[in-house]
């Protein structure tokens, strides 16, 4: 079991129960899933780029990514409906906790010119989204074998009812928010 999951059960639940005066342990917000998404718009011209992006995402997450396809045709972007244009991974359970721990302790501090993550990136329902400009911040990616530096979107979905609860949940994990 991941250390962060044990920490959540032992420390975070107690802290949030006193902070928000919950009656039951089941009311305490928890991390439900983490979604990693990599949009590869250049895949229209070269299908190999999408394979490389999927391989990077598989190395980062430890799980085979789902290839996402265009929902509708857009002439301005030269894409047709059904074209493969990206890949995504949804992490739950044990893999989610392990990735979350690696994200907080290893990957985020390796971001260039890092001054903290914005605390305003909540969606109104307690879910947090962030963008990473370079996939090379993850130690699983070998810098010498990277064909192109790509970014990815990371969404942390929680059971929190409000942004305040979601922010308190992530702050309890020492999430590096900007002061």
Swiss-Prot record:
GO molecular function: 5S rRNA binding; RNA binding; structural constituent of ribosome; tRNA binding
GO biological process: cytoplasmic translation; ribosomal large subunit assembly; translation
GO cellular component: cytoplasm; cytosol; cytosolic large ribosomal subunit
Gene3D superfamilies: 3.30.1440.10
Residues recorded as bearing N6-acetyllysine in the entry: 3
Keyword line: Acetylation, Ribonucleoprotein, Ribosomal protein, RNA-binding, rRNA-binding, tRNA-binding
One Pfam family here: Ribosomal_L5_C
Biological function: This is one of the proteins that bind and probably mediate the attachment of the 5S RNA into the large ribosomal subunit, where it forms part of the central protuberance. Its 5S rRNA binding is significantly enhanced in the presence of L18.
Note, other: Identified as a multicopy suppressor of the slow growth phenotype of an rsgA (yjeQ) deletion mutant.
Assembly with partners or alone: Part of the 50S ribosomal subunit; part of the 5S rRNA/L5/L18/L25 subcomplex. Contacts the 5S rRNA; cross-links to the P site tRNA. Forms a bridge to the 30S subunit in the 70S ribosome, contacting protein S13 and S19.
Similarity comment: family membership: Belongs to the universal ribosomal protein uL5 family.
Protein's recorded name: Large ribosomal subunit protein uL5
Organism: Escherichia coli (strain K12)
């Amino acid at each position: 079991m991941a250390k962060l999951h044990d920490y959540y059960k032992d420390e975070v639940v107690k802290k949030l129960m006193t902070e928000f005066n919950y009656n039951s342990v089941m009311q305490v917000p928890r991390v439900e899933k983490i979604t990693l998404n990599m949009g590869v718009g250049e895949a229209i011209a070269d299908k190999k780029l999408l394979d490389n992006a999927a391989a990077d995402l598989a190395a980062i997450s430890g799980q085979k990514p789902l290839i996402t396809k265009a929902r509708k045709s857009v002439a301005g972007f030269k894409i047709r409906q059904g074209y493969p244009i990206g890949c995504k991974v949804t992490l739950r359970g044990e893999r989610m906790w392990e990735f979350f721990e690696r994200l907080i302790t290893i990957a985020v501090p390796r971001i260039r010119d890092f001054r903290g993550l914005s605390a305003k990136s909540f969606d109104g329902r307690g879910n947090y989204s962030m963008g990473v400009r370079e996939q090379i911040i993850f130690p699983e990616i070998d810098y010498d074998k990277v064909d192109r530096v790509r970014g990815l979107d990371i969404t942390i979905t929680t059971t929190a009812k409000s942004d305040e609860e979601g922010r308190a949940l992530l702050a309890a994990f020492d999430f590096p928010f900007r002061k």
